[in-house]
From Swiss-Prot:
One of its GO terms (molecular function) is tRNA binding. Belongs to the universal ribosomal protein uL1 family. HAMAP family: Ribosomal_uL1_B. Keywords: Repressor, Ribonucleoprotein, Ribosomal protein, RNA-binding, rRNA-binding, Translation regulation, tRNA-binding. This is Large ribosomal subunit protein uL1. GO terms for cellular component: cytosolic large ribosomal subunit. Part of the 50S ribosomal subunit. Binds directly to 23S rRNA. The L1 stalk is quite mobile in the ribosome, and is involved in E site tRNA release. Protein L1 is also a translational repressor protein, it controls the translation of the L11 operon by binding to its mRNA.
Length: 234
């Protein structure tokens, strides 16, 4: 604990929490302070100008990051009939119906994403209280309820992330590992922001991207100067 406290105190002395950092300054700074013994993730928090109390302004969506997130994603698929072989051929880690539902009910959830074909939702819907709080319930908006099982698996395996805002209108997600090249992390961030811009609810007014912060798993959080990002996200 003492070492952690000393490390965080040293980092805190080098970070100006009132400053908005240029993205090309922020990434190297976060890399310099990633000194723990594992490869940390780079996380982003995007404060949006939405009213999260209104369902019409809530965002549930997905996008593909050009450089992935730095780890393999395990996919479970609810499928029956010909979709079983389609899912297996496409690279699903688990495929099933009642057996997969039983595994989930027992709390044995050793996968990251659940995909379901529409004809299996009568079963999947019974698992809502388990999958919902984990953010794993299949959803048409994120493409995880689909007729095209093979495409959904391919997109997820190739670096797709799914995201939704919390009650404060903030999107929290991972955009890669801190050992990525700086340009890869920047391009992943800008891909997310472009996707969020497309997701912008029609009812929102005023500033949409209110605040963008980057942090590593065990490191400090830096507020990003939006002027240093691509004009596509302004």
């Amino acid at each position: 604990m003492g070492k952690t406290t000393k490390r965080m105190r040293m980092i805190s002395n080098q970070i100006d929490r009132t400053k908005q950092y240029n993205i090309h300054e922020a990434i190297p700074l976060l890399k310099d302070h990633a000194t723990v013994k594992f490869i940390e993730s780079l996380d982003v928090a995007v404060k949006l100008g939405i009213n999260a109390r209104k369902s019409s302004q809530n965002i549930h969506s997905a996008t593909i990051l050009p450089h992935g997130i730095g780890r393999s994603i395990k996919v479970a698929v609810f499928a029956q009939g010909i979709n079983v072989s389609i899912a297996e051929t496409a690279g699903a880690d688990l495929v099933g119906m009642d057996n997969l539902a039983a595994q989930i009910t027992k709390g044995n959830i050793n996968f990251d994403v659940v995909i379901a074909s529409p004809d299996t939702m009568h079963l999947v819907s019974t698992l809502g209280q388990i999958l919902g709080p984990k953010g794993m319930m299949p959803n048409t908006k994120t493409g995880t309820i689909t007729q095209n099982i093979a495409l959904a698996i391919k997109e997820i395996k190739s670096g797709q992330i799914r995201y939704h805002n919390d009650k404060n209108g903030i999107i929290h997600t991972t955009i890669g590992k801190i050992n990525f090249e700086s340009y890869q992390l920047i391009e992943n961030l800008e891909a997310l922001l472009r996707a969020l811009k497309k997701d912008k609810p029609l009812q929102t007014k005023g500033i949409y991207f209110k605040k963008i912060c980057l942090s590593t798993t065990m490191g400090p959080s830096l507020t990003i100067d939006q002027c240093s990002l691509s004009t596509l996200v302004k």
